[in-house]
Amino acid sequence: HGGAYLIGSPATHRAITTHLARRCAAEVCAVDYRRAPEHPFPAARDDALAVYLALLEAGHSPRRLLLAGDSAGGHLALSLALELKACGLPLPAGLLLFSP
């Protein structure tokens, strides 16, 4: 979700995540990551990484996962993908970035 890593939550972005889920016939896992200034970057990325790894551990194929986000959430999705690549972890099928 957007919010400059300071504000926002999955609840504030429920309308768009619900719309995307319905239009794409997909499930959405919206991460309620830790926010700044109490938890500066990379705390949010670490939270997103933990969720991504939990999805893989639960049996979700990375080929069927898409990272998406708007504003700070777009940056978070992109930085997570770069961290996955740097760590040699399975990459998602794609990225959907709105104003990263």
What are these regions (language model features)?
Residues H1-P100:
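Domain-scale detector for complete catalytic domains at protein termini or as standalone homologs
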